[in-house]
């Protein structure tokens, strides 16, 4: 198993009466070892798992796949405060990798499409301008060369129309193009646009990348992703945050029980009976 880049994190400040330090899991955060190449943060919505992931992204100054970097995103001001209060302990510092919130991805895809369209328009305008001015094809080529190179690089990395694919296809294509060896990847609920089959494809990509010295920290609700072999799982439903086994997770137990007896579950739920225990 490959060694990790980010070995642990701890909190070293922050006002407990101000969000996000009012979140119980964040308030109680002391030290959190990150001993394995794949770490999962799991918990109910509002438990703090995504907030901590965003704080780590701010502290690590990772590139962001989204419409704005963590350092400039107006919606992440509180998470930047958290980032300043976190102490990251590195085994091997890496500047490779990225932070991704599933909810931001489609804004990113639209931004890529807009950038490509603007480059194409600029090329056409240059051609018209140079033709009207009687400029040579050589001069036009010198003008258009960098624009063509930028378009080619975008298409090489993301395809000609990333936003034209299905959500799941676009997501997986992004991962294929942006995962590089030796990177740190912070993924917030990456299962959101993915079918079960696509989640298995993502697991395969993660397995391939950790064999190339990558590290992943993932906030998720997905029992499929959480099943990754030898992953560290931290529950944010326990205060302080605690490591838990896969079989102990409510996400796993409830999903398994439901699939084993869906009619029994649905009968009780639809009759508004007390929840099953």
Residue spans for each PLM region:
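N-terminal pre-Walker A segment at the start of P-loop NTPase domains
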Residues: 1-30
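C-terminal lobe/lid and adjacent interdomain/linker elements of RecA-like ASCE P-loop ATPase modules
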Residues: 197-215, 222-277
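Conserved D-loop beta-strand region of ABC ATPase nucleotide-binding domains
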Residues: 188, 218-219
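Phosphate-binding P-loop
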Residues: 26-36, 177-181, 208
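Phosphate-binding glycine-rich loops of NTP-binding sites
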Residues: 36-70
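Conserved ABC ATPase signature
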Residues: 98-102, 111, 117-201
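Catalytic acidic motif of RecA-like/P-loop NTPases
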Residues: 39, 191-194, 207
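Flexible phosphate/Mg2+-sensing switch loops adjacent to catalytic phosphate-binding sites
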Residues: 62-90
């Amino acid at each position: 198993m490959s060694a990790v880049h980010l070995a642990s994190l701890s909190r070293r400040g922050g006002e407990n009466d101000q969000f996000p330090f009012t979140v119980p899991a964040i308030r109680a955060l002391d030290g959190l070892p990150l001993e394995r190449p794949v770490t999962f943060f799991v918990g109910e919505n509002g438990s703090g798992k995504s907030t901590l992931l965003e704080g780590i992204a701010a502290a690590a100054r990772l590139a962001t796949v989204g419409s704005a970097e963590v350092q400039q995103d107006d919606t992440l001001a509180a998470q930047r405060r958290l980032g300043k209060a976190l102490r990251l302990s590195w085994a091997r510092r890496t500047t490779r990798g990225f932070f991704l919130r599933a909810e931001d991805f489609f804004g990113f895809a639209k931004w890529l499409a807009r950038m490509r369209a603007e480059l194409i328009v600029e090329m056409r305008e240059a051609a018209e301008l140079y033709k009207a001015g009687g400029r040579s094809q050589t001069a036009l080529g010198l003008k258009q060369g960098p624009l063509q190179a930028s378009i080619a690089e975008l298409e090489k990395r993301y395809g000609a129309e990333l936003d034209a694919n299905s959500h799941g296809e676009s997501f997986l294509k992004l991962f294929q193009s942006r995962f590089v060896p030796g990177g740190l990847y912070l993924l917030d609920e990456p299962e959101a646009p993915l079918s079960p089959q696509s989640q298995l494809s993502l697991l395969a990509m993660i397995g391939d990348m950790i064999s190339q010295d990558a590290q992943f920290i993932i906030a998720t609700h997905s029992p499929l992703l959480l099943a990754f072999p030898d992953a560290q799982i931290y529950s944010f439903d326990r205060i302080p945050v605690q490591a838990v086994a896969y079989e102990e997770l409510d996400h796993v137990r409830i999903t398994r029980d439901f699939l084993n007896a869906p009619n029994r579950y649905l009968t009780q739920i639809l009759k508004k009976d007390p929840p099953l225990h």
